Curated annotation (Swiss-Prot):
Protein name: Imidazole glycerol phosphate synthase subunit HisH
NCBIfam families: IMP_synth_hisH (TIGR01855)
Single GO term (MF): imidazoleglycerol-phosphate synthase activity
Alphabetical list of InterPro entries matching this protein: Class_I_gatase-like, GATASE, Imidazole-glycPsynth_HisH
One Pfam family linked to the record: GATase
Domain Glutamine amidotransferase type-1 per the UniProt entry, residue ranges: 3-212
Assembly and interaction partners: Heterodimer of HisH and HisF.
Top-level taxon: Bacteria
Keywords: Amino-acid biosynthesis, Cytoplasm, Glutamine amidotransferase, Histidine biosynthesis, Hydrolase, Lyase
Record field: catalytic activity: 5-[(5-phospho-1-deoxy-D-ribulos-1-ylimino)methylamino]-1-(5-phospho-beta-D-ribosyl)imidazole-4-carboxamide + L-glutamine = D-erythro-1-(imidazol-4-yl)glycerol 3-phosphate + 5-amino-1-(5-phospho-beta-D-ribosyl)imidazole-4-carboxamide + L-glutamate + H(+); L-glutamine + H2O = L-glutamate + NH4(+)
Length: 212
């Protein structure tokens, strides 16, 4: 049976992610902060919620920045929400934070004066929104284009390499909802909270060989 390591660095509701993975038959799901267990896993999931400064402080304290660089190179790897944002170069949050830098680009604030067609938009962006699939990726298998996923975020990703944007969203501004490169895939939305389409994405991840 394959193993899926859900990286635990003290930030995020990891059990909901683990339960969703178990629900789709992903294999043996391990919530762990043990680097050896993470290195031995067949697949790795990197979730996260909260302030990016706190997240990055814990990631660096535990040595997970270098570990994430290592394990995301040679097996299927999925970043979720702040776990995705941590993979970028930097974030504007908390007066600026350097991140892991696996994907070029920056995490930017939606702003307090966000408008669309004369309507003021609340920040954080919270709720269901469409994701436009930019390319045909294995993790989009059996998920229709413009499927709706569940988002909760005040900061959005401005990708540095448009070719890595495999899914985009819009909330006052266009933003990268999904990034991919090699065996790495990352999403701003919460698949574990996104019902049918979110579970399908996790099922696709569980079956993906990491090639793209």
């Amino acid at each position: 049976m394959q193993t899926v390591a859900v990286i635990d660095y003290g930030m995020g509701n990891l059990h909901s992610v683990a339960k969703a993975l178990e629900h789709v038959g992903a294999g043996k799901v391990l919530i762990t902060s043990d680097a050896a267990v993470i290195r031995e896993a067949d697949r790795v999931v990197f979730p996260g919620v909260g302030a990016i400064r706190d997240c990055m402080a814990e990631i660096r304290r535990l040595g997970f920045d270098s570990l994430v660089r290592e394990v995301s190179q040679d097996r299927p790897f999925l970043g979720i929400c702040v776990g995705m944002q941590a993979l970028l170069d930097s974030s504007e949050e908390n007066d600026g934070v350097d991140c892991i830098g696996l994907f070029p680009g920056a995490v930017k604030f939606f702003g307090k004066d966000l408008h669309e067609d004369g309507e003021h938009l609340k920040v954080p962006h919270m709720g269901w929104n469409e994701v436009k699939q930019a390319v045909d990726h294995p993790l989009w298998h059996n998920i229709p284009d413009l499927a709706r996923f569940y988002f909760v975020h005040s900061y959005y990703i401005a990708a540095g390499n448009p070719r890595q944007v495999v899914g985009s969203g819009h909330y006052g501004v266009d933003f990268a909802a999904a990034l991919a490169e090699g065996s790495r895939f990352a999403v701003q939305f919460h698949p574990e909270k996104s019902h049918t389409h979110g579970l399908q994405l996790l099922q696709n991840f569980a079956a993906w060989d990491g090639r793209w």
